[in-house]
Amino acid sequence: MCLTEFTEQDFLELYQFMRPIWLETYGHILSAEHLDFLLTKYFSVDGVKTYRDKGYQYRKIDDVGVLVYVDRGEYTYMDKLYLTPNGRGKGYPKQVFDYLLSLGKDVVLNANQKNERAVQCYLKNGFVIEKEEVVDLGNGLFNPDYVMRKKRL
């Protein structure tokens, strides 16, 4: 697995890269309006700038995925991990989690409770559910999440 920092061109292309992944992942969970809102919030050039200004790191996973994370002091927060269908079933999540743990801290994430594929992946890779919470994403959208943690050994 090769994790590479995003180039400026990667940031310009991120929205288009993520759109089909999000339609597949959340199309049965969210309305089209909410999907467009969240895609713009997280993956538009302006949206990404907001997160980069807060210290979020963006990495390409080979040519099949995206990782977004940030150092939160006591732990590393994995904000986004998405793979194209081509990148699934090849062990990328475990390699990503190993990389994040190598930064020296526990890894914490939020997972949409309705995203069963992601929740099962995290559980299979040693994450535990610490709590449930409802996250206000804006625009009238509230997300039922699991807060999950993988401890650094």
Q: Where would I find each of the regions flagged by the language model?
A:
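A structural signal for short, well-ordered beta-strand segments and their strand-loop junctions
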Residues: 60, 107-108
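C-terminal "cap" of GNAT-fold acetyltransferases
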Residues: 108, 112-119, 123-125, 131-153
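Acetyl-CoA-dependent GNAT
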Residues: 5-11, 15-88, 94-99, 151-152
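Short glycine-rich hinge loops at helix-strand junctions in the catalytic core
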Residues: 91, 126
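Extreme N-terminal starter segment of soluble prokaryotic enzymes
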Residues: 1-3
